[in-house]
Curated annotation (Swiss-Prot):
Residues 22-249 form the Phosphagen kinase C-terminal domain. Keywords: ATP-binding, Kinase, Nucleotide-binding, Transferase. ATP binds at residues 25-29, 172-176, 202-207. InterPro entries: Arg_Kinase, ATP-guanido_PTrfase_cat, Gln_synth/guanido_kin_cat_dom. This is Protein-arginine kinase. Catalyzes the specific phosphorylation of arginine residues in proteins. Belongs to the ATP:guanido phosphotransferase family.
Amino acid sequence: MLPNHILTAIATIKHSLRTETPRPICTLSLSRNLSVSKFVPCLSKENKRDVLETIAKQFSAIEGEEFFVLPLKDLPIWQRECLLEHYLFPYHLGSYLEGEALIVNQAGTLLAGINLRDHLVIHGVDFVWQPEVLLQKLIDLDIRLQQSLSFAFSSDFGFLTADPLRCGTALIARAFVHVPALKYGDALSELLVPYQREFASSSLLPLSQESLGDILCLSNICSLGLSEEQILSSLRLVVSKILSAEREARNQLVKENPTEIKNRILRSVGMLTHSCCLDLQEALDATSWIQLGMSMQWIEDSEKHPLWNPLFWDLRRGHLALYNQDTANRSIEKEVIAQIRAKATKPQAERLIIRI
């Protein structure tokens, strides 16, 4: 179990990065496999434990930085959820957790997954849309690990992974973009057509197709035959076009001044102000509409605080359990979390000033 003060310090990093305009958020993942072991789907329990022990030992030996090895079978569910939420980790964790682990550094900048789809996934989250800086951190850690670990590598196919399309650099780059105006105008699907061979669009949550909070998640489909720089450059290009289209869509909404948009925004404020239970879909969708209203200067915060960050994370159940429950009695039961979520959003909604 991760010490509570360490987890709190990691989770609150986002609170110091408040900006009036939400920026795209980026996550990067490098996949690696040990050259001496079979891929994860072919490993026995004993083999998975051996892989975990081998990799964890090397993290512990890294000088100048402290890492915490967290076997999933021993990690409380709420704490596991909180870590996955903070890092926007893209992998769904099943019920069979033997030989699987998460590893975090004390600075809260990096997360590693052991024996998930591959033996090792080195993962990081970038809150300020500087993916090149994050990539260098991942590469630096990868180089340090390669001093003592031999990763499966082919001169023809690069780093070998369980998914053939993920070989090569084995880099997955994801961008999370807030696009409420494009979603409202049903313009997003057409906008993404030219890029659908390069990038996949998905939901905020793994294994879910539902759109939450008007958030678009884009990730590269293939890393084979592409350099890290090419992947990031392509991602930046697509995101810039999406942001430009979103700005145009918002300007159009302001010009048209539609009653329906204002009505949705005001209803969202009312929902967050007066609800006694809120599920994640309701809360994120309402927050998205309010953030749209703030960008149009129809709503402002009396304390001049932006709403979207950190609420983008803080409405999720792991964070709600961390911030709003006693240490000895944390629960992520649906009914309990729905009540806590409504209680947590109420004071933030009450200090909003309506300019419509």
